[in-house]
Amino acid sequence: MSHSVKIYDTCIGCTQCVRACPTDVLEMIPWDGCKAKQIASAPRTEDCVGCKRCESACPTDFLSVRVYLWHETTRSMGLSY
């Protein structure tokens, strides 16, 4: 079961989440929407182990990166039994 990793537009391009990820799920990609000219991206969500270290590392007030564990995702969609 894979987890869902969402990157929000509040990302400031600091790379903290990328450096915190033990399985290299995240990477930085070019983006003109912030001063750093880069934003986090999650191209390898199948490797996410759900540790949420990226969330803990995020310095923004509203977490720019969120990991939704499989059971959290299905519960929010009303699919859990």
UniProtKB/Swiss-Prot annotation:
Catalytic activity annotation: reduced [plastocyanin] + hnu + oxidized [2Fe-2S]-[ferredoxin] = oxidized [plastocyanin] + reduced [2Fe-2S]-[ferredoxin]
Matches recorded under Pfam families: Fer4_21 (PF14697)
Record's bilayer topology term: Peripheral membrane protein
Domain 4Fe-4S ferredoxin-type: 2-31, 39-68
Function, in words: Apoprotein for the two 4Fe-4S centers FA and FB of photosystem I (PSI); essential for photochemical activity. FB is the terminal electron acceptor of PSI, donating electrons to ferredoxin. The C-terminus interacts with PsaA/B/D and helps assemble the protein into the PSI complex. Required for binding of PsaD and PsaE to PSI. PSI is a plastocyanin-ferredoxin oxidoreductase, converting photonic excitation into a charge separation, which transfers an electron from the donor P700 chlorophyll pair to the spectroscopically characterized acceptors A0, A1, FX, FA and FB in turn.
Descriptive protein name: Photosystem I iron-sulfur center
Gene3D superfamilies: 3.30.70.20
